[in-house]
């Protein structure tokens, strides 16, 4: 008799088909106890969480990301849910504070979530990763880029932290290229101005390692300060050729307004995510190391679904991808539990399997039911996760020219070495 247990090309066994075979052979009465522990009774919801800044300076990013994650939940439920169970979303407000996030995480965990999207801010993800690993919950961040998160969230032989946004190690290489390259800024001496948190300090440290230019000043700043003139004065005290600026949309304005009000003049190179909307005239000639904004089919489908968010905030589409990967991983594993999701999330993110994308969770379920490999093609990118459960992504060197953003050079992900699965 031909076995119903199938082995995929990634070496994993299709547990969903194994369960079906067990029920057919043994009968529901014999196998019912085991079945309910894995698949539920068809009514109990699978709960995923979200930790996001829904108030404060990052409120727009947090609320847009929440809306995208809600859309992912709706798409999964429209396809029949995870393992025939509806998905529910438990959302808590981190307020962009690690202390608040830890408190709200405990509340969310008490609701019975098996994994969560978040944090957005690197400080929050750094605080939550060890807790999630200890509790056996899968955490997938759509926006935390600190290099210190590579290898975070490990418990035994499992990694419980992943992200759908690449590490700042990649961004630092592109910022350094824009500052050093004779085709761009061609600076000999650079001042680094960075937001005073794990994201800012981590990217600044990586810039030190990748710059050929000497660093004239390191200036950390508090985005909630009342006066930013001292930040600009310190940055220009030793007459640098350029400024490398590490910040985030919504937290950069104070420093840049202070620069505009000063008599200093030099090109700036921005970290990603700050060249959007109406650009001030003094941005002319500024550069950015930006994530490549390739409009994938998944991106176009999702932004059409989220047409009320125009323009959509950075990282929102990454939030959609985070939820979809966890849902697909649970479906692949045949079990809606954190350890099972951690074991399967890389397998559904890349490789040579059959592709599915935004709004196609029904296709993923059908393929997995048939014992096939799947490969999620996300809204943000292909999202092929490496062994540290983070993607490599292409970047673009951009420059503000005549009030618009000009793309100067595409840096393919192969430039950074390595690969996803």
Residue ranges with predicted function:
Residues 2-26, 31-421:
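Extracytosolic ligand-binding ectodomains
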């Amino acid at each position: 008799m031909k076995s119903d247990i199938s082995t995929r090309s990634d070496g994993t066994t299709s547990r969903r088909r194994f369960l079906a075979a067990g029920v057919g052979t043994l009968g529901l009465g014999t196998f019912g106890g085991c079945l309910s522990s894995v698949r539920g009774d068809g009514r109990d919801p699978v709960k995923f969480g979200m930790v996001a800044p829904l108030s404060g300076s990052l409120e727009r990013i947090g609320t847009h990301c929440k809306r995208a994650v809600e859309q992912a939940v709706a798409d999964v439920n429209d396809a029949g849910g995870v393992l025939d169970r509806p998905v529910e979303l438990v959302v808590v407000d981190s307020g962009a504070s690690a202390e608040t996030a830890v408190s709200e995480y405990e509340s969310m965990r008490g609701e019975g979530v098996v994994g969560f999207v978040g944090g957005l801010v690197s400080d929050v993800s750094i605080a939550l990763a060890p807790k999630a690993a200890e509790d056996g919950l899968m955490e997938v961040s759509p926006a935390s880029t600190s290099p210190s998160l590579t290898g975070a969230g490990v418990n035994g032989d499992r990694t419980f932290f992943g992200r759908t946004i690449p590490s700042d190690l990649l961004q630092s290489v592109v910022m350094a290229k824009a500052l050093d390259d004779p085709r761009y800024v061609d600076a000999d001496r650079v001042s680094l101005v960075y937001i005073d948190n794990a994201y800012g300090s981590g990217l600044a440290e990586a810039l030190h390692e990748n710059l050929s230019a000497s660093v004239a000043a390191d200036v950390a700043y508090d985005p909630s300060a009342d006066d930013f003139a001292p930040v600009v004065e310190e940055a220009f005290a030793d007459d640098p050729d350029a400024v490398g600026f590490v910040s985030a949309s919504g937290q950069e304005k104070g420093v840049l307004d202070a620069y505009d009000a000063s008599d200093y003049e030099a090109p700036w190179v921005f970290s990603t995510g700050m060249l959007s909307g109406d650009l001030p005239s003094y941005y002319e000639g500024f550069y950015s190391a930006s994530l490549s904004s390739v409009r994938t089919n998944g991106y176009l489908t999702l932004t059409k679904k989220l047409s009320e968010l125009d323009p959509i905030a950075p990282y929102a589409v990454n939030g959609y991808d985070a939820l979809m990967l966890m849902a697909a991983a649970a479906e692949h594993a045949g079990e809606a539990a954190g350890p099972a999701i951690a074991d399967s999330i890389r397998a559904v993110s890349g490789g040579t399997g059959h592709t599915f994308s935004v709004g196609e969770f029904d296709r993923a379920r059908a393929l997995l039911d048939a014992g096939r490999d799947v490969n999620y093609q996300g809204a943000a990118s292909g999202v092929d996760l490496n062994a540290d459960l983070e993607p490599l992504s292409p970047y673009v060197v951009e420059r503000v020219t005549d009030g618009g953003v000009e793309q100067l050079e595409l840096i393919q992900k192969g430039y950074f070495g390595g690969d996803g699965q």
